[in-house]
């Protein structure tokens, strides 16, 4: 739901079959196909419906608190210029944060949830299910379900339930039923598997509110369109504040919804460098990471073809990240296409690097970022000192870090 694409654009996908080049599609059980086609029909009806867009805009403004601020990170910029000077480089770009952490519920997830709950209402559904990793999508789903009077079930890996207890409590307060998933490693992939099983069983009355830009078509498209408000706002805001577009934009990539939301409105701005940050975990030499585009290969998972972490037999591998929201062995199909097209660079950041960026941002900005966002900030910390002072970098601060304080305390050997 941003500006129209142009000829020879990077923004024209997906095609009618839901494909971005060789990625995407809808690989689902026969039981689900009629529901997927019905969802696509309703999505095609509402995506250009002015009444639907007006209702979504009203909710986004008065309920979620949009537009989110584009904030000049003066403290971080000053720190990185000092680093640049100490290295004899004499540079250091200006760093801006797109403050999705200031939204209602504390992250970008509310953008998508508001859009999808309105779609569920149009479709006449009576029950909402969702999957969650870090818990932010679960909280946002429970929030919109409460706002519109829907019962809500959230599937969450048992590992994530343990490391994201504040968000589990928030979901329950909002009236959602949280179902821990013990299969596999008990993380986001396993939660999504269980949500899909629920959906197959309850196809008539249930709406599956997917939280990321993955899954079968039309989910990658509709999630992207609901999240593209991030980039649409950021593009207008930087033009107003600096009089020009940024040189570089950076966002963390798990499934990839916050990233594609920032990236999509900038894809045809050829002078804007776009960088997606994957979870490098404990390093790409082993298997303890979630860098599917740096260390994976194409395959099918959760209804779409995309880059995955898989073994030689095509079995999906369980990755690792300090960040529950990046702990997913795949990525949205549009990201896979953007990787192969060369338009977007995808770079891994290690757990330790993200943790250092988390601490640095807290100290120099007075902002506690989500560990997902800290991955993106960590890459900015690497590249900004070597850039010129008149250059501009936008980092998507996708969520706040309240949910991560227990994880960080444990990593730092502190007791809360």
From Swiss-Prot:
What are the entry keywords?
Answer: Amino-acid biosynthesis, Aromatic amino acid biosynthesis, Lyase, Pyridoxal phosphate, Tryptophan biosynthesis
Q: Which pathway is this protein assigned to?
A: Amino-acid biosynthesis; L-tryptophan biosynthesis; L-tryptophan from chorismate: step 5/5
Q: What is this protein called?
A: Tryptophan synthase beta chain
The free-text function statement in the UniProt record for this protein reads:
The beta subunit is responsible for the synthesis of L-tryptophan from indole and L-serine.
SUPFAM superfamilies the record matches: Tryptophan synthase beta subunit-like PLP-dependent enzymes
Its GO CC terms are: cytoplasm
Give the quaternary structure. Tetramer of two alpha and two beta chains.
* EC numbers, comma separated: 4.2.1.20
* Residues bearing PTM N6-(pyridoxal phosphate)lysine: 109
User: What is this organism's lineage?
Assistant: Bacteria, Pseudomonadati, Pseudomonadota, Alphaproteobacteria, Hyphomicrobiales
Lineage: superkingdom: Bacteria
> Which top EC class is given?
lyase
Q: Which organism is it from?
A: Mesorhizobium japonicum (strain LMG 29417 / CECT 9101 / MAFF 303099) (Mesorhizobium loti (strain MAFF 303099))
Q: Which gene encodes it?
A: trpB
The entry sums up its family as follows: Belongs to the TrpB family.
